[in-house]
Every structure is written in C-alpha cells, then in structure tokens.
Regions:
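Charged, amphipathic alpha-helical segments and their flanking helix caps
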Residues: 1-31, 38-125
Length: 125
C-alpha cells in the first residue's frame, strides 16, 4: 500500500467516526440516507507538504440546523490543536482550515449542507 492509499484509509476512518456515514464525494452509494458526510481529499504532493480540501455535512432540512452544528462541533473538537495520525511512511496532521465552516447558500430542496475546510500536512518518519 502506498502513502496516498494509506492517507485515504486514515481519512476514511476519521470521517466515519462521528456517528454518521462518511463517503468519498464521488462514491455515495445509491439509496444512501441522510445524514451523511462527503469528502474529497487532496493528498499533499510530498513529505512535509501541505494541502487543503473540504468535506460537506448533509442533513435533512426537516431536522433544523442543530444536528448539523452538533456534528460540526464534534469534528472541530477532534481537531483541536491539530490531529496527528500515523500512516504508512510517516503521519498526517489534520487541522481546521480557514474559514472552518460555512453553510451552503442554495442546497437542494430538503437538504441542509455545511462546508468544512481542512488543512492536511504529510509528515515523513
């Protein structure tokens, strides 16, 4: 397994750790039910390099904003001070990007969506 695949596995585990399913943005299974999180990682080009990417929290609008904000808070708390996670050949540091969270202006009807911005640094051993 290469470094990029290892980083993708680490990110998948991270994004599935908040009580809702996490899917790669282009791999949402047919029939997936809300709520869920989608993400599209950008893997840094080399060791000690940084990249940014986003994830999206998707919730039914009928639930109001509280559940989406609670999940956002859980993810934010997990990243407090940066989260260092070992992976093949080193580790990644995952941090909140700037701006951290912002609602989607015109989500599809019946949906609420919040963008979350991340910074990722790939560190060598």
């Amino acid at each position: 397994m290469g470094a990029a695949e290892s980083i993708n596995r680490v990110l998948n585990t991270f994004f599935n750790g908040f009580g809702i399913p996490g899917y790669l943005e282009d791999s949402i299974p047919p029939g997936a039910e809300l709520p869920y999180l989608t993400y599209k990682p950008t893997i840094p080009g080399g060791w000690n390099e940084e990249a940014s990417f986003h994830a999206r929290l998707w919730y039914p609008s009928s639930a109001g904003r509280l559940p989406i904000l609670q999940t956002e808070d859980k993810i934010s708390a997990a990243l407090a001070g940066g989260l260092t996670v070992p992976c093949e050949g080193g580790a990644i540091v995952l941090r909140k990007g700037t701006p951290w969270a912002q609602p989607m202006d015109n989500p599809p009807e019946g949906y609420l969506c919040e963008y979350l911005n991340f910074e990722i640094t790939q560190l060598c051993e």
